[in-house]
Amino acid sequence: MVLINQLGAVLAVCATLTVAAPTKGKARFNVPQVAIPKKMVHHPAVSYARALHKFGMKVPKTVQDAAKGSVPTTPTPSDEQYVTQVTVGEGKLNLDLDTGSGDLQGHNLYKPTSNSKRLNGYSWQISYGDMSSAGGDVFLDTVSIGDVTASSQAVESAKKVSDQFAKDKATDGLMGLSFSVLNTVQPKPQTTFLDTVLSQLEKPLFTCTLKHGEPGSYDFGYIDDAKHSGEITYTQVDNSEGWWGFTADSYSIGGPNTTSFRGDSSGMANGGSISGIADTGTTLMLLSDDVVGEYYGQVQGATNDQQQGGYIFPCDAQLPDFTLSIGGYNAVVPGKFMNYQEIDGSMCFGGLQSSGSSGGPNIFGDVFLKSQFVVWDTQGPRIGFAPQA
């Protein structure tokens, strides 16, 4: 870890909103994402390690070792992170909107102003599976996104940061859109951005339209019917632990009518249901060993490579589609989305990896979410899916 004064800056992130600014009527607004440089400076196993650690799963030594490596060739462009501009105090930060976090955390310049207020005795600390970490003090400041402003936001100002965070120039941090129970500010957790601004929104929901290979967008307070085709299928959310958790009735590899379809003809669970967490802050999709092994068993040349820290395959391999059946709706992830990143000129790292042998949670990250139009509705709560228009 490097003390922040040695870096010549105060790194920060916004964690939680406690007071929403008054508004006339109800707000609805669109927030476009910002394109970030596509050239990656770390091994793809870093994304894998961070995802495992984020959800309390053991990070195998092989993954840790691979995450410390580098990619010697210019990699194929990948959708590692999606960022959105958020005004924090007097500055603008490019943040990853993260439904798997209750904080707003980051690693870019933050300067408390005369309007900022330190929360004495409050602190924060985060770490990830690739050994990156940051921590520091908490201030109250103004945070705005779109047409909504929180006038008293808990801003996590970093006093120390590891080299991994200091070298990450692609994004400035993350804004949590989970339920407030996940907030990590101590000694008293704060409300999330989403929970704070709900009263300002026309409807207590937001949607995301993540894209493959290009920026997408978030809409707050309304559903833009021009962004999806067909009806939206909803399913109940389990938020008992703060996550946007849901259960898919069944899955299939190669299509819902293939022999690997798990479930009966009605689409109801028959030993093939998959419960997991929808998380825009996780790049990959993580499923159980048997499902992942079954998928790559249909990919010629695929192998679980210990040196690379996960499943890899020839970059020109034909990858089958992966389908989740949710309330009678088939959410299809095109096979090409499963090709996450080139690692050595001929082999590629998979966008689907194992959630571990210890029974860790399944994670429906961006590899899955960018194939769908998704509604995150706090009433219920529930989550909805439809094909993107």
From Swiss-Prot:
Classification lineage: Eukaryota, Fungi, Dikarya, Ascomycota, Pezizomycotina
EC number: 3.4.23.-
Residues annotated as the enzyme's active site: D98, D279
InterPro entries, sorted: Aspartic_peptidase_A1, Aspartic_peptidase_AS, Aspergillopepsin-like_cat_dom, PEPTIDASE_A1, Peptidase_aspartic_dom_sf
Family label: Belongs to the peptidase A1 family.
Localization: Secreted
Subunit structure: Monomer.
Keywords for this protein: Aspartyl protease, Disulfide bond, Glycoprotein, Hydrolase, Protease, Secreted, Signal, Virulence, Zymogen
Signal peptide span: 1-20
CDD domains linked: Aspergillopepsin_like
Protein name: Aspartic protease pepA
Domain Peptidase A1: 82-386
GO molecular function, one term: aspartic-type endopeptidase activity
